From Swiss-Prot:
Pfam families: Ribosomal_L6 (PF00347). Part of the 50S ribosomal subunit. InterPro entries: Ribosomal_uL6-like, Ribosomal_uL6-like_a/b-dom_sf, Ribosomal_uL6_a/b-dom, Ribosomal_uL6_bac-type, Ribosomal_uL6_CS. One of its GO terms (molecular function) is structural constituent of ribosome. This is Large ribosomal subunit protein uL6. One of its GO terms (cellular component) is cytosolic large ribosomal subunit. The keyword RNA-binding applies. It comes from Acidothermus cellulolyticus (strain ATCC 43068 / DSM 8971 / 11B). This protein binds to the 23S rRNA, and is important in its secondary structure. It is located near the subunit interface in the base of the L7/L12 stalk, and near the tRNA binding site of the peptidyltransferase center. It comes from the Bacteria. Signal peptide: none annotated. Belongs to the universal ribosomal protein uL6 family. Transmembrane segments: none annotated. Keywords: Ribonucleoprotein, Ribosomal protein, RNA-binding, rRNA-binding.
């Protein structure tokens, strides 16, 4: 069995997990998430309140789906209890971010400000003019929104200017040699 897939998924108090055919719905204090399970995989609820992900055979694809499904359901439970956050930093002279209602307005060296609207289930928090946080209950959506914002002005390798994840190391290059 998959080493990750065979681990039981603990369901904390205050979280309600419903298994309806191939659909798993997780309700918690922060919201509701739904996931459709791939064909050969099954999810069972045990008497002790944990979830068990099972697979029928040891085919390569099935083994991969086994661990993936277990991790996705565990992330759904974490999302509806604690939520997920991704912190981004802005480096560069004149580069900054400010909140405009629920939107973010970036000054990134373009001739115009760039406005980013949060999709449903995502919220933004501006900590300083050069640091902000993307919050949400869906880990995939939080990461996707953060990656799209980073794409607006990727960190460039010569001066390191741009939008980066907190703690990200930007590989620097040496500039051209002068005379």
């Amino acid at each position: 069995m998959s080493r990750i897939g065979r681990l039981p998924i603990p369901v904390p108090a205050g979280v309600d997990v419903t298994i309806d055919g191939r659909t798993v719905t997780v309700k918690g204090p922060r919201g509701t998430l739904t996931h459709t399970i791939a064909e050969p995989i099954t999810v069972e609820k045990a008497e002790d309140g944990t979830l068990h992900v099972r697979r029928p055979d040891d085919e390569n694809r099935t083994r991969g789906l086994h661990g993936l499904t277990r991790t996705l359901i565990a992330n759904m439970i974490t999302g509806v209890t604690q939520g997920f956050a991704k912190t981004l930093e802005i480096v560069g002279t004149g580069y900054r971010v400010q909140a405009r209602g629920s939107d973010l307005e970036f000054a990134l060296g373009f001739s115009h400000p760039v406005v980013v609207r949060p999709p449903e289930g995502i919220s933004f928090e501006v900590q300083t003019p050069t640091r902000f946080v993307v919050h949400g209950i869906d880990k995939q959506k939080v990461g996707e929104v953060a990656a799209n914002i980073r794409k607006l002005r990727k960190p460039e390798p010569y001066k390191g200017k741009g939008v980066r994840y907190q703690g990200e190391n930007v590989r620097r290059k040496v500039g051209k040699a002068g005379k």
